[in-house]
């Protein structure tokens, strides 16, 4: 982004040789050098890992300079995102091996960036959902080997708009074809993404496998609830689902008590394997903690977003 402005004037440029052009070039070069220094200061602030990611903690650039950098710029954000995604995709594709396709875990989750007060500039983006007020985003997170990448997100805008599971479907639809053709895709999510429509879509249209949570009240085609089943790994037919799935469960600690959570897989696995895959969904929680507590994402301003 800054390489163009760091280069020396070419012969063609010198051929214009008027003082005004030279002054303008120096001004532009100085401006973008300042941008670069500001970016380095922001990254240093974030990567220090102290959880002080807001501008007034920066010791090398003023709070106003950082605010200008984040709010007033003339480069394309979309182009920057495409560049970063291209770099990530190349890293992932480098993991390809001959023989059996490696697995890419696609983690889906909805998180809330809680906000207090009035936000006129954000209009309908700040909502109350699950007793939390803030910006609710559905995030798609990729895991392959030791690599972990946030890939994309969508904002949940509340009742009457696309639901979290519908937003997840849009995110999955936008996965690059070279990725889906080169790897086995396992989609992991909690009960918010365990809807019958989404599971059918993932398996029948996208041809991915899915391991998601379902509520204990979910019924089988024979009328029984999943909570009545006693054998892990057994094949079951859920009401409203066209394909067979395999059921298991995990035990979690909540408020000092053990709570049972049910997990289904569209791929045949042993019960203990399904449970292990189900637990992998919580890998994304580490990412959420990082972006909130180290990068201070939950403290974004109304115009920075």
Where are these regions (language model features)?
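Active-site-proximal, Lys/Arg-enriched surface segment
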Residues: 71-145
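Generic alpha-helical scaffold signal
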Residues: 36, 60, 64, 131-134, ...
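Non-membrane alpha-helical segments in proteins
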Residues: 37-45, 108
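Acidic/polar, glycine-rich intrinsically disordered N-terminal extensions of enzymes
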Residues: 47-54
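Long, contiguous hydrophobic alpha-helical segments, chiefly transmembrane helices and signal peptides
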Residues: 66, 137-138, 153, 193
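Short, basic interhelical loop/turn and adjoining N-cap
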Residues: 57-71
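Single, function-defining residue in the core of a domain
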Residues: 1-36, 40, 50, 99-102, ...
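Short low-polarity hydrophobic stretches
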Residues: 56, 140-142, 210
